[in-house]
Amino acid sequence: MRPEIAVLDIQGQYRVYTGFYRADAAENTIILINGSLATTASFAQTVRNLHPQFNVVLFDQPYAGKSKPHNRQERFISKETEAHILLELIEHFQADHVMSFSWGGASTLLALAHQPRGVKKAVVSSFSPVINEPMRDYLDRGCQYLAACDRYQVGNLVNDTIGKHLPSLFKRFNYRHVSSLDSHEYAQMHFHINEVLQHDLERALDGARNIDIPVLFINGDRDEYTTVEDARQFSKHVGRSHFSVIRDAGHFLDMENKTACEDTRSVMLGFLKPTMREPRHRYQPVKQGQHALAI
């Protein structure tokens, strides 16, 4: 299962690497938004859960993954800017749904507050409107280690906290990935944490009141950092909010064990299953060999 690769130009400012997993029988397209320090590779299991029921789009932020070589890392990118990048991708791929993981939820809620045309439903996983004590400790220590560019501590911090329930093999992959990131990625994450601690989450929640589509919030019952109880407070901000709990799962949900993977897939498909609607033009890529450049 190989994606159709395109590097898209976003308003002449950023180049964004995208992978489009086409399913010929699918009528709906979903865009996946990853969390901090993550890349398109983090969504391998989620793609298997959603494809071929849906066309699936993955992308890397301009400062991360396969988008990095296409951008000059001259300035930090705010969550608001990430939201506008997402809006451009929604329009380009004519997406019906979006799904975010962890802190990708902040830019997703900011984007949905603009009520993008064509988006029918959203899934927000492992995210919370509350920065509780475990999460605050995680962010505070992360800020300290990122500022010092302490790769050993950053790698261990992720595995010892939000990744504590991952299988050992995934922890090794996690450590190798997180501890080998470029210094500008550490600086970008440091910037994001400060945004969150100062005002960014509050801004996302204020904007969430404008969201007019159904949003499903999924959390694991073993997740101490974005808890089931805290996530339910989204009902105060998102009018058409729905909630699902994945049993015996922590922050990383479908990556943690087979049962959690099956339950997460069942919950997602149950919420997103296509309904009868008017036919719409299906996305066709710009054909320029393996890589496409679209405005």
UniProtKB/Swiss-Prot annotation:
The protein's Enzyme Commission number: 2.4.1.-
GO molecular function: transferase activity
Matching Gene3D superfamilies: alpha/beta hydrolase
A Pfam family this chain is assigned to: Abhydrolase_1
EC class: transferase
Domain AB hydrolase-1: 28-254
Pathway info: Polyester biosynthesis; polyhydroxyalkanoate biosynthesis
Keyword annotations of the record: Transferase
Function: Catalyzes the transfer of the acyl moiety from in vitro synthesized 3-hydroxydecanoyl-CoA to acyl carrier protein.
Name of the molecule in the record: (R)-3-hydroxydecanoyl-ACP:CoA transacylase
Organism (species): Ectopseudomonas oleovorans
Species lineage: Bacteria, Pseudomonadati, Pseudomonadota, Gammaproteobacteria, Pseudomonadales
Gene encoding the protein: phaG
